[in-house]
Amino acid sequence: MSRTVFCARLKKEGEGLDFQLYPGELGKRIFDNISKEAWAQWQHKQTMLINEKKLNMMDPEHRKLLETEMVNFLFEGKDVHIEGYTPPSE
């Protein structure tokens, strides 16, 4: 049976993650407060951010930048700004 969480990003109940996907206290916070739907949104933004900014995940500064963007996106309600990207009009 899947567990439900009140998602901090989407501000609604949703299916929780199956296991902790990120290490440490931040990982526990994500596991306890972020839904699968919001995590999937973050993964999409994360991929775009890594590609557009040409981030190297071996570089500690780049990892820290990505972690900061992740916290801002998931918990602060801020969207990821990617220079030069124009979202498709709906």
Curated annotation (Swiss-Prot):
Identify the GO cellular component terms for this protein: cytosol
An example GO biological process term is:
cellular response to oxidative stress
Pfam families linked: Iron_traffic (PF04362)
Q: Which Gene3D superfamilies match?
A: Fe(II) trafficking protein YggX (1.10.3880.10)
- Give UniProt keywords alphabetically: Iron
> Molecular function (GO) terms listed?
iron ion binding
Return the HAMAP family for the record.
Fe_traffic_YggX
Output the PANTHER family linked to this UniProt entry.
Answer: FE(2+)-TRAFFICKING PROTEIN-RELATED
Q: What does this protein do?
A: Could be a mediator in iron transactions between iron acquisition and iron-requiring processes, such as synthesis and/or repair of Fe-S clusters in biosynthetic enzymes.
Homology family:
Belongs to the Fe(2+)-trafficking protein family.
- Protein name (Swiss-Prot/TrEMBL): Probable Fe(2+)-trafficking protein
